[in-house]
Swiss-Prot record:
5-phospho-alpha-D-ribose 1-diphosphate binds at A128, N129, G130, D131, A132. The gene is xpt. GO terms for biological process: purine ribonucleoside salvage; xanthine metabolic process; XMP salvage. It catalyses: XMP + diphosphate = xanthine + 5-phospho-alpha-D-ribose 1-diphosphate. One of its GO terms (molecular function) is xanthine phosphoribosyltransferase activity. This is Xanthine phosphoribosyltransferase. Its EC number is 2.4.2.22. Pathway: Purine metabolism; XMP biosynthesis via salvage pathway; XMP from xanthine: step 1/1. One of its GO terms (cellular component) is cytoplasm. It is found in: Cytoplasm. The keyword Glycosyltransferase applies. Pfam families: Pribosyltran (PF00156).
């Protein structure tokens, strides 16, 4: 997705060789037009898969996930990082480690909103080691639903996330693949010297 690559180049900030900050359009301030286009692109890629639900994790996955849900005309469900006191019924849960924050959270989804007839597209902002997507896939399995695919806005291809997801039998679609953050510079897959 050219517009996304342009945004990453123009507004992304390389923190170190493993962390890319995209607060200006995705993780803090949200570029709504760009997220609309992201959602539409995921729709075009998965429109024939019978998607019934979009699943993400709070907070940064919500913007691209809700835009995808709008295009699919299905609900967007997000896993919560803490069980709210209002959640009285059963839950599906998984442990998820955040690469960026270096923390582990137990995320929960109410069993009221995810069931065995659901065909789920998991959406996330970043793919690093794949822990978030694998954890969300575990929640889908607990519900006896089907994960149709994983949609990633920015993939750090130099980390093992894609390989881990594909080893788990999951279809991965990344809209922007970063090959390297070396030398304080973003290099995209296909642009390596």
């Amino acid at each position: 997705m050219d517009l996304l690559k342009q945004k990453v180049e123009a507004d992304g900030v390389v923190i170190d060789e493993k962390i890319l900050k995209v607060d200006g359009f995705l993780n803090h301030q949200i570029d709504a037009r760009l997220m609309h286009d992201v959602g539409q692109t995921f729709y075009e890629q998965f429109k024939d898969e019978g998607i019934t639900k979009i699943l993400t994790i709070e907070a940064s996955g919500i913007a691209p996930a809700i835009m995808a849900a709008m295009h699919f005309d299905v609900p967007c469900l997000f896993a919560k990082k803490a069980k709210p006191s209002t959640l009285k019924k059963g839950v599906y849960q998984a442990e998820i480690h955040s690469f960026t924050k270096n923390t582990t959270s137990t995320v929960v989804v109410s069993d009221e909103f995810l069931g065995e007839n659901d065909r789920v597209l998991i959406i996330d902002d970043f793919l690093a080691n794949g822990d978030a997507s694998l954890g969300l896939n575990e929640i889908v399995k607990q519900a006896k639903a089907t994960t149709v695919g994983i949609g990633i806005v920015v993939e750090k291809s130099f980390q093992p996330g894609r390989e881990r997801l594909e080893e788990a039998g999951l279809t991965v679609s990344s809209l922007c693949k970063v090959a390297s953050l070396s030398g304080n510079k973003v290099t995209f897959v296909g642009d390596e010297a």
